[in-house]
């Protein structure tokens, strides 16, 4: 299937993000260039590297939202990380290579899901057979002659890394007929609420040291997971829920994980995208403390990843040569030139995102596919209340949000969420007890509820 064109990508982003056309175009072109590169001969492909993007702009103007929506649009492995979470090598914390390992995990998840779809019908059939056997169990054999054989089979299975072998059973004609009847009812969906006892793999217990080890790039549970036998527990569940769990287990048995890992590594390396947020927070612009040294160290650790290197993952080595990196930051107290020169050079495309105007706020309230106003209307619809905003009310909300941003810290579109929550506080509180009907939010109501916010000079409680 042909990839989405740059114009189609921008059109999709327009459904959720107001303005910032330059940023949308840059991202769309970079994404489509991946498709162009894939059409070229291999000897040419290897010399064409992605043009990484650096987005700079005030907080709340859409940088992170562009990344979030990209993940929904592109059919490629995508991870978003925060630069402030990383520490340079030698310090306690996450090392920068963990972002590449996260991308590998995401690629495996995507490919695994695709492979599961291919074997889903077969897995459902096998799960239904298991359910029939559980609902109408056979007669278990228990004689001295086969006890030694069962013991040998059990030992062989455990040594091979499998679980306990299934017990042999005897199926009489009566049981066979009952199973045929139950199988027919299962197919017709008549037994979905019947309870059945199944054995499922026990979920791993939370390890207090797990988070610390994970931050240091060491996932011991994953490393040892395949070596240790899987413990199973019995659960009593309705047939519908039991089938889902059994289908998941059957799908894992039917797919070839070696192929999945190989495809995933190839996809992550050729079409993966890593979005690095808050990159301005690791600049060394502030020289007043020793933190600048550590921040510059993080930049130097990120540099080889962005330049192109090979990172070891639990699925195999992953090359970052053709991964697209998109970095973003507000740069309120620093500027892109405060990054080390080598790292600046690895982000050749610079995009400046503009501060939001009052007209932008009006569009943000109304235009996006799931705008804030539409969200509140849907929430109150659950109580049987029809919420309506007049055009004048929307204009006034945008005006107040813009004024508060100008008078205090400018937090962009995030200010609208604070303003709307204050405006609709009473309606949301009384909503469940109101009789079904329509509530119209007018300009006068907005002024009544929010006038104090504009008049009061101490607006700290309205800062997110």
Swiss-Prot record:
<dbReference type="InterPro" id="IPR003593">
    <property type="entry name" value="AAA+_ATPase"/>
</dbReference>
<keyword id="KW-0067">ATP-binding</keyword>
<comment type="similarity">
    <text>Belongs to the ClpX chaperone family. HslU subfamily.</text>
</comment>
<dbReference type="GO" id="GO:0043335">
    <property type="term" value="P:protein unfolding"/>
</dbReference>
<comment type="subunit">
    <text>A double ring-shaped homohexamer of HslV is capped on each side by a ring-shaped HslU homohexamer. The assembly of the HslU/HslV complex is dependent on binding of ATP.</text>
</comment>
<dbReference type="GO" id="GO:0016887">
    <property type="term" value="F:ATP hydrolysis activity"/>
</dbReference>
<feature type="binding site">
    <location>
        <position position="277"/>
    </location>
    <ligand>
        <name>ATP</name>
    </ligand>
</feature>
<dbReference type="InterPro" id="IPR050052">
    <property type="entry name" value="ATP-dep_Clp_protease_ClpX"/>
</dbReference>
<dbReference type="GO" id="GO:0009376">
    <property type="term" value="C:HslUV protease complex"/>
</dbReference>
<keyword id="KW-0547">Nucleotide-binding</keyword>
<dbReference type="Pfam" id="PF07724">
    <property type="entry name" value="AAA_2"/>
</dbReference>
<dbReference type="GO" id="GO:0036402">
    <property type="term" value="F:proteasome-activating activity"/>
</dbReference>
<dbReference type="GO" id="GO:0008233">
    <property type="term" value="F:peptidase activity"/>
</dbReference>
<feature type="binding site">
    <location>
        <position position="414"/>
    </location>
    <ligand>
        <name>ATP</name>
    </ligand>
</feature>
<dbReference type="Pfam" id="PF00004">
    <property type="entry name" value="AAA"/>
</dbReference>
<dbReference type="Pfam" id="PF10431">
    <property type="entry name" value="ClpB_D2-small"/>
</dbReference>
<comment type="function">
    <text>ATPase subunit of a proteasome-like degradation complex; this subunit has chaperone activity. The binding of ATP and its subsequent hydrolysis by HslU are essential for unfolding of protein substrates subsequently hydrolyzed by HslV. HslU recognizes the N-terminal part of its protein substrates and unfolds these before they are guided to HslV for hydrolysis.</text>
</comment>
<dbReference type="InterPro" id="IPR027417">
    <property type="entry name" value="P-loop_NTPase"/>
</dbReference>
<dbReference type="InterPro" id="IPR003959">
    <property type="entry name" value="ATPase_AAA_core"/>
</dbReference>
<dbReference type="GO" id="GO:0051603">
    <property type="term" value="P:proteolysis involved in protein catabolic process"/>
</dbReference>
<keyword id="KW-0963">Cytoplasm</keyword>
<dbReference type="GO" id="GO:0005524">
    <property type="term" value="F:ATP binding"/>
</dbReference>
<dbReference type="InterPro" id="IPR004491">
    <property type="entry name" value="HslU"/>
</dbReference>
<keyword id="KW-0143">Chaperone</keyword>
<protein>
    <recommendedName>
        <fullName>ATP-dependent protease ATPase subunit HslU</fullName>
    </recommendedName>
</protein>
<dbReference type="InterPro" id="IPR019489">
    <property type="entry name" value="Clp_ATPase_C"/>
</dbReference>
<feature type="binding site">
    <location>
        <position position="18"/>
    </location>
    <ligand>
        <name>ATP</name>
    </ligand>
</feature>
<feature type="binding site">
    <location>
        <begin position="60"/>
        <end position="65"/>
    </location>
    <ligand>
        <name>ATP</name>
    </ligand>
</feature>
<feature type="binding site">
    <location>
        <position position="342"/>
    </location>
    <ligand>
        <name>ATP</name>
    </ligand>
</feature>
């Amino acid at each position: 299937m042909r990839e989405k064109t740059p114009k189609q990508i921008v059109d999709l982003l327009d459904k959720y993000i107001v303005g910032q056309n330059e940023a949308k175009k840059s991202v769309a072109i970079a994404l489509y260039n991946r498709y162009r590169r894939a059409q070229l001969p291999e000897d040419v492909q290897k010399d064409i590297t992605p043009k990484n993007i650096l987005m700079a702009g005030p907080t709340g103007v859409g940088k992170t939202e562009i990344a979030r929506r990209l993940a929904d649009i592109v059919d490629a492995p995508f991870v978003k990380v925060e630069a402030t979470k990383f520490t340079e090598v030698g310090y306690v914390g996450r090392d920068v290579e963990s972002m590449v390992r996260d991308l590998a995990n995401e690629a495996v998840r995507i490919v695994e899901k695709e492979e599961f779809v291919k074997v889903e019908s077969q897995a459902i059939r096998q799960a239904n057979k298991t359910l029939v056997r559980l609902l109408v169990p056979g007669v278990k054999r228990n004689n001295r002659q086969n006890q030694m054989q069962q013991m040998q089979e059990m030992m062989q299975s455990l040594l091979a890394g499998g679980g306990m072998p299934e017990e042999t059973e005897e199926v009489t004609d009566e049981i066979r007929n009952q199973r045929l009847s139950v199988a027919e009812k299962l197919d017709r969906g008549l037994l979905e609420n019947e309870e059945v006892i199944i054995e499922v793999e026990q979920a791993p217990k939370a390890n207090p040291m797990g988070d610390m080890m994970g931050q240091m790039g060491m996932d011991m549970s994953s490393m040892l997971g395949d070596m240790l036998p899987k413990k199973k527990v019995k659960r009593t569940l309705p047939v519908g829920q039991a089938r889902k769990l059994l289908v998941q287990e059957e799908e894992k048995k039917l797919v070839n994980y070696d192929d999945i890992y190989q495809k995933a590594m190839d996809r992550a390396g050729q079409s993966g995208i890593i979005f690095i947020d808050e990159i301005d927070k690791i600049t060394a612009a502030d020289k007043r403390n020793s933190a600048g040294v550590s921040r510059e160290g993080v930049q130097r650790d990120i540099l080889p990843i962005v330049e192109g290197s090979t990172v070891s993952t639990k699925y195999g080595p992953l090359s970052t040569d053709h991964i697209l990196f998109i970095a973003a930051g507000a740069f309120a107290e620093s500027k892109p030139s405060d990054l080390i020169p080598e790292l600046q050079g690895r982000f050749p495309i610079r995009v400046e995102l503009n501060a939001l105007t009052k007209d932008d706020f009006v569009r943000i309230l109304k235009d996006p596919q799931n705008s804030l106003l539409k969200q509140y209307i849907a929430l109150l619809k659950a109580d049987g209340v029809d919420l309506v905003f007049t055009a004048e009310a929307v204009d006034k909300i945008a005006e107040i949000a813009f004024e508060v941003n100008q008078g205090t810290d400018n937090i962009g579109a995030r200010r609208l969420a604070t303003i709307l929550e204050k405006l609709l506080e009473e309606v949301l509180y009384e909503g469940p007890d109101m009789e079904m009907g329509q509530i119209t939010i007018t300009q006068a109501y907005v002024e009544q509820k929010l006038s104090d916010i504009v008049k009061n000079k101490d607006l700290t409680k309205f800062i997110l």
